[in-house]
C-alpha cells in the first residue's frame, strides 16, 4: 500500500506541473481563444485528475470490494421482498378470540394461531358450538311438552284406576270357590293320616261324616228340651200348688215364689215315681250322652297309647 501511495504522489505532481505550464502559457497567448492543446487532448481540473488516476491505479481487489459493498445494500433491500410477498399472499389474519361456554371454566382468549397444536385444538372446538344450541333447545322442548314416558305413566295410572273395581269384583267371586277347594284338599290330606293313626281301631276309620252329622243333630234337638219341659212342669204344678191348701203357703207376699219352692219336693217325688214327668226323659238323655262321650274319650286315649308305626311282625296279645 505504501508503494502504491508513493507511486500516486509523483503522478499528481506531474499533473500539477503540466497544468501550471499550460495555465502560464495561456496569458502569453491571450490574443487567440483556442487552446494550444491538441484536439484529442482536453483540460481536466486537478481534483478530477487525481480521482481518475487513483481509479486507474487501484488494484482489482479494491474494485471488487467496492462492488461488493454496493451490491450488499442492494441484496439487503431485495431479501425482505420475498418475505413481504409471502405475507401479502397469505393475507392479514384476523385475531380470533375463543371463549369457553358459560357453564364451563373460564379461559383466556387465544390470540396466536402460529402453532399447529393450537390449530388442531381450535378445529376441535369449532365443532362443539353447533351442538350447544341443540342441548339448549332440549330443555325448552321438555318444559313445553311432557316427555312420552310421563304420558305413558299417566295412562297406566288411569287404566289401573278403572280396572281396580273390576279386579276386586272378580277376586271376590273367585275367593269363594278357592276356599272350598282348600277345605276339600285339607280333608283329603287328613283322611289317610287318620286312617294310618287309627289302624289299631278300624271302627274309627269306618266312621264317616254321616255319623258326625247325626250326633250334631241330636245335640241340637236335646238343647231346647229342658226349656219346654220346664214350662210344661210349671203349668202342671200351678193347680197342684193351689190344691195343697194354705198350710204349705209361705209368708212371702208374691204368689209366684210359692210354686218355685214347692217344685223341689214335687220334683224329688216325681223322680222317685216311674214314668212320671218329662224331667225323667231329660235325665236319661243326658246319661246316654255322657256315656257316648266317655266311650269316645276312651277310644281316643287308646289310639294315643297305641304305636304310630305298624309292627313289622305280628304281635300276639
UniProtKB/Swiss-Prot annotation:
InterPro entries per record: DUF4691 (IPR031516)
Span list, region Disordered: 1-164
Disulfide topology: none
Compositionally biased residues, Polar residues: 19-34
Protein name: Uncharacterized protein C16orf86
Biased composition (Basic and acidic residues): 1-11, 47-58, 71-92
Bias type Basic residues, positions: 100-110, 151-161
Lineage of origin: Eukaryota, Metazoa, Chordata, Craniata, Vertebrata
Gene: C16orf86
Source superkingdom: Eukaryota
Amino acid at each position: 500500500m505504501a508503494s502504491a501511495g508513493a507511486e500516486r504522489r509523483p503522478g499528481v505532481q506531474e499533473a500539477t506541473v503540466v497544468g501550471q505550464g499550460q495555465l502560464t502559457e495561456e496569458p502569453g497567448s491571450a490574443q487567440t481563444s483556442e487552446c494550444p492543446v491538441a484536439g484529442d487532448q482536453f483540460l481536466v481540473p486537478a481534483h478530477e485528475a487525481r480521482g481518475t488516476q487513483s481509479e486507474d491505479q487501484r488494484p482489482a481487489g479494491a474494485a471488487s470490494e467496492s462492488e461488493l459493498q454496493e451490491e450488499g445494500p442492494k441484496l439487503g433491500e431485495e431479501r425482505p421482498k420475498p418475505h413481504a410477498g409471502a405475507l401479502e399472499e397469505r393475507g392479514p389474519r384476523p385475531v380470533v378470540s375463543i371463549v369457553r361456554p358459560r357453564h364451563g371454566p373460564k379461559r383466556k382468549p387465544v390470540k396466536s394461531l402460529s402453532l399447529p397444536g393450537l390449530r388442531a385444538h381450535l378445529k376441535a372446538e369449532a365443532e362443539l358450538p353447533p351442538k350447544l344450541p341443540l342441548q339448549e333447545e332440549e330443555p325448552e322442548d321438555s318444559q313445553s311438552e311432557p316427555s312420552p314416558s310421563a304420558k305413558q305413566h299417566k295412562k297406566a295410572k288411569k287404566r289401573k284406576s278403572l280396572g281396580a273395581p273390576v279386579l276386586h269384583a272378580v277376586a271376590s267371586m273367585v275367593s269363594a270357590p278357592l276356599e272350598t277347594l282348600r277345605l276339600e284338599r285339607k280333608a283329603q290330606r287328613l283322611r289317610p293320616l287318620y286312617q294310618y293313626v287309627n289302624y289299631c281301631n278300624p271302627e274309627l276309620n269306618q266312621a264317616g261324616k254321616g255319623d258326625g252329622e247325626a250326633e250334631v243333630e241330636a245335640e241340637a234337638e236335646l238343647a231346647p228340651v229342658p226349656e219346654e219341659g220346664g214350662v210344661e212342669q210349671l203349668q202342671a204344678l200351678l193347680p197342684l200348688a193351689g190344691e195343697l191348701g194354705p198350710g204349705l203357703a209361705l209368708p212371702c207376699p208374691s204368689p209366684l215364689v210359692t210354686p218355685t219352692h214347692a217344685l223341689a219336693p214335687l220334683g224329688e217325688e216325681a223322680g222317685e215315681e216311674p214314668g212320671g214327668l218329662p224331667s225323667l226323659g231329660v235325665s236319661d238323655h243326658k246319661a246316654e250322652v255322657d256315656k257316648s262321650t266317655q266311650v269316645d274319650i276312651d277310644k281316643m286315649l287308646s289310639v294315643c297309647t297305641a304305636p304310630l308305626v305298624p309292627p313289622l311282625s305280628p304281635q300276639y296279645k
